[in-house]
Each structure stands twice: as C-alpha cells, then as structure tokens.
Amino acid sequence: MALLTAKTFSLQFNNKRRIKRPYYPRKALLCYQLTPQNGSTPTRGYFKNKKKCHAEIRFINEIKSMGLDETQCYQVTCYLTWSPCPSCVRELVAFIKAHDHLNLRIFASRLYCHWCRRQQEGLRLLCGSQVPVEVMGSREFADCWENFVDHEKPLSFNPSEMLEELDKNSRAIKRRLERIKQSWSVDVLENGLRSLQLGPVSSSLSRSNSR
C-alpha cells in the first residue's frame, strides 16, 4: 500500500491550536485499518479529500467495493486529521447501519469547527449511532505513525519528540470533545423530563451545561 511521507504526517496531523509561519493548509486525511475477526491480515490504506468528494466518502466507497463477507465481523479503525463534517457524518451513519457486520471506531487529531452547533450535533449523531468518536492520543498517534508512514527516508525531526508533543496537545482537545458529549447528555435528559411533563429543568442543571 502507499504510505504517507513523514513530513505529510507531521504537518497534517499537527494538532496545535495555531500553527506558526510559514502557514500551510491543514487538509483532511483518513487512514483506515480493516481487521477481520478471523485473524486474517489487516487491510490498510488512506484517502485525501478530492474535489467534490471528501476522504470519508472515498473510504466508504472503497469498503463497499471490497465485497466483504457479510457473515464475518470486521473491526474498522479510522484515524482522521479532522473530525467529519455533518454531511459525511450522515453518510457514515447510513453506511454503518446498512453494514452491521462492521464495527467502526473513529479517532480524530482535531475537531472541525467544534464551536458550530451543526458540527457538535454531527459528533453527537455518530456517538448516538454506536460509532465511537474519540480524540487521538499517544497510542493512536504511535499506531498511525508506525503503520501508515514511510520510515525509510531520513527524517528532519525527532519522531519521539513529535509524538510527545501531539499527545500533549491532544489533552485540551479531548476535554473539548468531552464537554460536547456532556452537553448532549444534558440535552437528552432535558428532553426526557419535558416528555414526562415533570416541569422545567432546574437552573442548576442548566448551569452545569454552560461552557
């Protein structure tokens, strides 16, 4: 399979809040690993966004084209530079619902437009559809580096230091995602209380949802 260059990995999976000059676009990349539960060799690959076709859609089309045995279960792990947009979320949810022999897990280096309500609702939709979404940490960055990057060419940086920095930066992003998930839980509780006609939600509960 084609591998990412070390430079591409270091630039595109960079999870700093702000990047230093020279500025560059942080593009969407999706690395996937499909592992059959019968112990067969995993299948790996990666996709970039193309014009009018996001990496997530290219990934879905690739899995569909494999003609997988629907009597066998598969674990699919995706490492993304950006969390999916709302449109891709809907496609991923529909895909997984139609292929219940696939168990999909998503790990993102960064949260795309996390302050926008539509983006937050997309993340909630994935979690509510039994598609775990988490922020990449030390284990995921190391696995992605090990399995999707070409290590044969000389490096201009220290990989260990890079991975440590990625893990350090990921902590704030993990807290941000956790707040989004918690706000979803509170919204569900509020709706449940209203449907039971138990009156308005207490102000203390509402305050606990402020960010």
Curated annotation (Swiss-Prot):
Keyword Metal-binding: yes
Function: DNA deaminase (cytidine deaminase) which may act as an inhibitor of retrovirus replication and retrotransposon mobility via deaminase-dependent and -independent mechanisms.
GO molecular function: cytidine deaminase activity; RNA binding; zinc ion binding
GO cellular component, one term: nucleus
Alphabetical list of PANTHER family matching this protein: DNA DC-DU-EDITING ENZYME APOBEC-3H, MRNA EDITING ENZYME
Entries under PROSITE patterns matching the protein: CYT_DCMP_DEAMINASES_1, CYT_DCMP_DEAMINASES_2
The protein's required cofactors: Zn(2+)
GO biological process, one term: DNA cytosine deamination
Species this protein is from: Pongo pygmaeus (Bornean orangutan)
Protein name (record): DNA dC->dU-editing enzyme APOBEC-3H
Compartmental location: Cytoplasm
Active site, renumbered: 56
Other remarks on this protein: APOBEC3H from old world monkeys has retained its antiviral activity, while it is lost in other primates.
Residue sites binding Zn(2+) per the record: 54, 85, 88
Catalytic reactions on record: a 2'-deoxycytidine in single-stranded DNA + H2O + H(+) = a 2'-deoxyuridine in single-stranded DNA + NH4(+)
